[in-house]
Amino acid sequence: MAWLLFMDECGHDHNAVPYEVRGGFAIADSALWPFVQDVHRLELECFGARLADYKSEIKGTKLLARDRFKNGLRDPVFDKATRQALCRAHLQDGLEKKPPGKLKLTAYGQASLKMADGIFDLLERHKALIFATAVPRGEGKPVKGEPPPPDILRKDHTFLLERFCYFLEGKREMGLLVMDEVEKQEDRRFVQRMHDYFQKTGNGRYRSKWIVPSPFFVASDMALPVQVADVVIYVLSWGYRREREMTGPTRLEIAERYEHRIDKLKWRGEGYDGVKTFRSFGIVCVPDLYKPRK
Protein backbone atom coordinates (compact mmCIF):
# COMPACT_ATOMS: atom_id res chain seq x y z
CA MET A 1 0.00 0.00 0.00
CA ALA A 2 1.09 3.58 -0.62
CA TRP A 3 0.05 6.89 0.92
CA LEU A 4 -0.64 10.06 -1.04
CA LEU A 5 0.07 13.40 0.62
CA PHE A 6 -2.15 16.04 -1.00
CA MET A 7 -0.60 19.45 -0.45
CA ASP A 8 -1.46 23.10 -0.92
CA GLU A 9 -0.18 26.34 0.53
CA CYS A 10 -1.69 29.51 1.93
CA GLY A 11 -0.27 32.78 3.21
CA HIS A 12 2.66 32.95 0.80
CA ASP A 13 1.64 36.53 -0.04
CA HIS A 14 2.53 37.40 3.61
CA ASN A 15 -0.64 39.46 3.92
CA ALA A 16 -4.00 37.83 4.49
CA VAL A 17 -3.43 35.09 7.07
CA PRO A 18 -1.32 34.90 10.25
CA TYR A 19 0.68 31.85 9.12
CA GLU A 20 2.22 30.70 5.88
CA VAL A 21 1.12 27.07 5.86
CA ARG A 22 2.25 24.26 3.61
CA GLY A 23 0.87 20.77 3.76
CA GLY A 24 -2.43 18.96 3.74
CA PHE A 25 -3.53 15.41 4.39
CA ALA A 26 -2.24 11.92 3.66
CA ILE A 27 -4.59 9.13 2.69
CA ALA A 28 -4.05 5.48 1.80
CA ASP A 29 -4.29 4.67 -1.90
CA SER A 30 -7.08 2.17 -1.24
CA ALA A 31 -9.16 4.88 0.49
CA LEU A 32 -8.66 7.61 -2.11
CA TRP A 33 -11.44 6.82 -4.58
CA PRO A 34 -14.07 6.14 -1.87
CA PHE A 35 -13.03 9.44 -0.26
CA VAL A 36 -13.37 11.37 -3.54
CA GLN A 37 -16.79 9.83 -4.18
CA ASP A 38 -17.93 10.79 -0.69
CA VAL A 39 -16.73 14.39 -1.16
CA HIS A 40 -18.69 14.58 -4.43
CA ARG A 41 -21.81 13.31 -2.65
CA LEU A 42 -21.27 15.78 0.18
CA GLU A 43 -20.96 18.66 -2.29
CA LEU A 44 -24.27 17.72 -3.94
CA GLU A 45 -25.91 17.26 -0.54
CA CYS A 46 -24.82 20.71 0.62
CA PHE A 47 -25.19 22.86 -2.49
CA GLY A 48 -27.45 20.80 -4.72
CA ALA A 49 -24.86 21.16 -7.49
CA ARG A 50 -21.23 20.70 -8.40
CA LEU A 51 -19.42 23.99 -7.79
CA ALA A 52 -17.22 23.35 -10.83
CA ASP A 53 -20.33 23.62 -13.02
CA TYR A 54 -20.57 27.24 -11.87
CA LYS A 55 -16.86 28.05 -12.30
CA SER A 56 -16.19 27.77 -8.58
CA GLU A 57 -14.37 25.29 -6.35
CA ILE A 58 -14.00 24.17 -2.76
CA LYS A 59 -11.61 26.55 -0.98
CA GLY A 60 -11.08 27.54 2.62
CA THR A 61 -11.28 31.24 1.79
CA LYS A 62 -14.69 30.68 0.19
CA LEU A 63 -16.29 28.19 2.57
CA LEU A 64 -15.08 29.87 5.76
CA ALA A 65 -14.99 33.57 4.94
CA ARG A 66 -16.27 35.83 7.71
CA ASP A 67 -19.46 36.61 5.83
CA ARG A 68 -20.09 32.88 5.28
CA PHE A 69 -20.18 32.41 9.05
CA LYS A 70 -22.34 35.50 9.50
CA ASN A 71 -24.81 34.38 6.84
CA GLY A 72 -24.70 30.69 7.69
CA LEU A 73 -25.48 31.10 11.38
CA ARG A 74 -28.53 33.32 11.01
CA ASP A 75 -32.17 32.27 10.70
CA PRO A 76 -34.05 30.82 9.00
CA VAL A 77 -32.43 27.38 8.91
CA PHE A 78 -33.51 25.90 5.58
CA ASP A 79 -34.49 22.31 4.90
CA LYS A 80 -32.33 20.44 2.38
CA ALA A 81 -34.48 20.97 -0.71
CA THR A 82 -34.93 24.70 -0.06
CA ARG A 83 -31.25 25.20 0.72
CA GLN A 84 -30.17 23.41 -2.44
CA ALA A 85 -32.57 25.37 -4.65
CA LEU A 86 -31.44 28.69 -3.17
CA CYS A 87 -27.77 27.70 -3.54
CA ARG A 88 -28.21 26.85 -7.22
CA ALA A 89 -29.96 30.16 -7.76
CA HIS A 90 -27.15 31.98 -5.93
CA LEU A 91 -24.48 30.27 -8.03
CA GLN A 92 -26.35 31.11 -11.22
CA ASP A 93 -26.65 34.73 -10.08
CA GLY A 94 -22.88 34.74 -9.72
CA LEU A 95 -22.42 33.62 -13.31
CA GLU A 96 -24.82 36.30 -14.48
CA LYS A 97 -23.27 38.92 -12.18
CA LYS A 98 -26.56 39.61 -10.44
CA PRO A 99 -26.58 41.09 -6.92
CA PRO A 100 -27.04 38.41 -4.23
CA GLY A 101 -30.27 38.19 -2.26
CA LYS A 102 -30.38 37.79 1.52
CA LEU A 103 -32.13 34.41 1.57
CA LYS A 104 -29.74 33.03 -1.04
CA LEU A 105 -26.75 34.27 0.93
CA THR A 106 -28.14 32.65 4.08
CA ALA A 107 -28.65 29.32 2.31
CA TYR A 108 -25.20 29.46 0.73
CA GLY A 109 -23.61 30.25 4.08
CA GLN A 110 -25.38 27.28 5.67
CA ALA A 111 -24.25 25.02 2.82
CA SER A 112 -20.66 26.26 3.08
CA LEU A 113 -20.42 25.50 6.81
CA LYS A 114 -22.08 22.14 6.27
CA MET A 115 -19.52 21.37 3.56
CA ALA A 116 -16.57 22.30 5.78
CA ASP A 117 -17.97 20.24 8.67
CA GLY A 118 -18.52 17.30 6.34
CA ILE A 119 -14.97 17.46 4.98
CA PHE A 120 -13.55 16.86 8.45
CA ASP A 121 -16.06 14.05 9.02
CA LEU A 122 -14.87 12.36 5.82
CA LEU A 123 -11.19 12.82 6.63
CA GLU A 124 -11.79 11.02 9.92
CA ARG A 125 -13.94 8.32 8.33
CA HIS A 126 -11.29 7.51 5.72
CA LYS A 127 -8.46 7.58 8.29
CA ALA A 128 -6.60 10.50 6.75
CA LEU A 129 -3.76 12.20 8.63
CA ILE A 130 -2.67 15.84 8.61
CA PHE A 131 0.92 16.88 7.90
CA ALA A 132 1.72 20.59 7.72
CA THR A 133 4.22 23.29 8.61
CA ALA A 134 3.32 26.80 9.75
CA VAL A 135 5.62 29.82 9.37
CA PRO A 136 4.58 33.05 11.17
CA ARG A 137 3.61 35.84 8.79
CA GLY A 138 6.67 37.79 7.70
CA GLU A 139 9.15 35.07 8.65
CA GLY A 140 8.83 33.60 5.16
CA LYS A 141 10.67 36.62 3.78
CA PRO A 142 14.47 36.31 3.85
CA VAL A 143 16.52 38.91 5.70
CA LYS A 144 17.16 41.92 3.49
CA GLY A 145 20.53 41.62 1.81
CA GLU A 146 20.83 37.95 2.76
CA PRO A 147 18.87 35.98 0.15
CA PRO A 148 18.74 32.23 0.77
CA PRO A 149 20.51 29.94 -1.71
CA PRO A 150 18.09 29.43 -4.62
CA ASP A 151 18.90 25.72 -4.88
CA ILE A 152 18.28 24.81 -1.21
CA LEU A 153 14.96 23.38 -0.04
CA ARG A 154 13.44 25.59 2.65
CA LYS A 155 13.44 24.43 6.26
CA ASP A 156 9.65 24.16 6.44
CA HIS A 157 9.65 21.85 3.40
CA THR A 158 12.33 19.60 4.90
CA PHE A 159 10.47 19.41 8.23
CA LEU A 160 7.30 18.44 6.37
CA LEU A 161 9.12 15.69 4.48
CA GLU A 162 10.76 14.58 7.72
CA ARG A 163 7.43 14.04 9.52
CA PHE A 164 5.88 12.30 6.52
CA CYS A 165 8.93 10.04 6.32
CA TYR A 166 8.72 9.14 10.02
CA PHE A 167 5.13 8.06 9.46
CA LEU A 168 5.91 6.04 6.32
CA GLU A 169 8.92 4.38 7.88
CA GLY A 170 6.80 3.25 10.80
CA LYS A 171 4.23 1.81 8.40
CA ARG A 172 6.92 0.35 6.07
CA GLU A 173 5.01 1.84 3.13
CA MET A 174 5.79 4.29 0.32
CA GLY A 175 4.53 7.86 -0.02
CA LEU A 176 3.70 10.08 -2.99
CA LEU A 177 3.50 13.89 -3.02
CA VAL A 178 0.61 15.52 -4.91
CA MET A 179 0.77 19.31 -5.08
CA ASP A 180 -1.28 22.20 -6.40
CA GLU A 181 0.41 23.65 -9.45
CA VAL A 182 1.11 27.36 -9.06
CA GLU A 183 3.28 28.83 -11.79
CA LYS A 184 5.16 26.55 -14.15
CA GLN A 185 8.55 28.21 -13.83
CA GLU A 186 8.38 28.30 -10.03
CA ASP A 187 7.16 24.70 -9.96
CA ARG A 188 10.18 23.68 -12.05
CA ARG A 189 12.51 25.43 -9.61
CA PHE A 190 10.84 23.66 -6.72
CA VAL A 191 11.20 20.28 -8.43
CA GLN A 192 14.91 20.97 -8.94
CA ARG A 193 15.35 21.89 -5.27
CA MET A 194 13.46 18.75 -4.30
CA HIS A 195 15.64 16.67 -6.63
CA ASP A 196 18.83 18.15 -5.13
CA TYR A 197 17.56 17.50 -1.61
CA PHE A 198 16.81 13.84 -2.31
CA GLN A 199 19.99 13.27 -4.33
CA LYS A 200 22.63 15.40 -2.62
CA THR A 201 21.83 15.36 1.11
CA GLY A 202 22.16 12.46 3.51
CA ASN A 203 18.68 12.95 4.99
CA GLY A 204 17.17 13.30 1.54
CA ARG A 205 18.80 10.13 0.22
CA TYR A 206 17.58 8.20 3.23
CA ARG A 207 14.04 9.56 2.97
CA SER A 208 13.86 8.68 -0.73
CA LYS A 209 13.55 5.07 0.48
CA TRP A 210 10.04 5.99 1.63
CA ILE A 211 9.02 9.10 -0.34
CA VAL A 212 9.01 9.08 -4.15
CA PRO A 213 11.31 12.07 -4.89
CA SER A 214 9.29 13.29 -7.87
CA PRO A 215 6.13 15.21 -6.85
CA PHE A 216 3.01 15.26 -9.01
CA PHE A 217 1.53 18.68 -9.85
CA VAL A 218 -2.19 19.00 -10.55
CA ALA A 219 -4.60 21.86 -11.22
CA SER A 220 -6.65 22.32 -8.06
CA ASP A 221 -9.87 22.98 -9.97
CA MET A 222 -9.59 19.47 -11.42
CA ALA A 223 -8.32 17.67 -8.31
CA LEU A 224 -10.82 17.47 -5.47
CA PRO A 225 -8.34 16.18 -2.83
CA VAL A 226 -6.12 19.24 -3.36
CA GLN A 227 -9.18 21.44 -2.78
CA VAL A 228 -9.78 19.58 0.48
CA ALA A 229 -6.13 20.19 1.43
CA ASP A 230 -6.75 23.91 0.88
CA VAL A 231 -9.59 23.84 3.41
CA VAL A 232 -7.41 21.98 5.93
CA ILE A 233 -4.50 24.43 5.79
CA TYR A 234 -6.79 27.49 5.83
CA VAL A 235 -8.36 26.21 9.05
CA LEU A 236 -4.91 25.47 10.44
CA SER A 237 -3.66 28.98 9.71
CA TRP A 238 -6.61 30.73 11.36
CA GLY A 239 -7.84 28.30 13.99
CA TYR A 240 -5.17 25.91 15.25
CA ARG A 241 -2.99 27.07 18.15
CA ARG A 242 -2.00 23.91 20.03
CA GLU A 243 1.66 24.10 19.05
CA ARG A 244 3.66 26.07 21.61
CA GLU A 245 5.08 28.58 19.12
CA MET A 246 1.75 29.32 17.42
CA THR A 247 0.61 32.51 19.15
CA GLY A 248 -0.61 34.48 16.12
CA PRO A 249 -4.06 36.09 15.71
CA THR A 250 -6.97 33.67 15.65
CA ARG A 251 -10.45 33.68 14.19
CA LEU A 252 -12.40 32.36 17.15
CA GLU A 253 -15.31 31.10 15.07
CA ILE A 254 -12.92 28.83 13.15
CA ALA A 255 -10.95 27.77 16.25
CA GLU A 256 -14.06 26.89 18.24
CA ARG A 257 -15.53 24.85 15.41
CA TYR A 258 -12.47 23.11 13.98
CA GLU A 259 -9.38 23.23 16.20
CA HIS A 260 -10.25 19.94 17.90
CA ARG A 261 -10.87 18.37 14.47
CA ILE A 262 -7.38 19.35 13.29
CA ASP A 263 -5.83 18.08 16.50
CA LYS A 264 -7.59 14.74 16.18
CA LEU A 265 -6.37 14.27 12.59
CA LYS A 266 -2.75 15.34 12.99
CA TRP A 267 -0.25 12.50 12.88
CA ARG A 268 1.30 11.40 16.18
CA GLY A 269 4.18 8.97 16.21
CA GLU A 270 7.89 8.52 16.71
CA GLY A 271 10.95 9.99 15.02
CA TYR A 272 14.54 8.81 15.10
CA ASP A 273 17.66 10.98 14.89
CA GLY A 274 20.21 8.21 14.53
CA VAL A 275 20.74 7.99 18.29
CA LYS A 276 17.36 7.88 19.98
CA THR A 277 13.64 7.80 19.27
CA PHE A 278 11.33 10.63 20.31
CA ARG A 279 7.72 11.73 20.03
CA SER A 280 6.90 13.51 16.80
CA PHE A 281 3.83 15.21 15.33
CA GLY A 282 2.47 15.96 11.88
CA ILE A 283 2.10 19.70 12.50
CA VAL A 284 5.18 21.80 13.22
CA CYS A 285 5.64 25.55 13.60
CA VAL A 286 8.82 26.98 12.05
CA PRO A 287 9.41 30.46 13.54
CA ASP A 288 13.11 30.40 12.63
CA LEU A 289 12.92 29.76 8.90
CA TYR A 290 16.24 31.39 8.03
CA LYS A 291 18.06 30.83 11.33
CA PRO A 292 20.12 27.75 12.22
CA ARG A 293 18.83 25.52 15.01
CA LYS A 294 21.18 24.42 17.74
Regions found by a protein language model. Give the residues of each.
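Phosphate-ester processing/binding pockets and catalytic centers
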Residues: 1-294
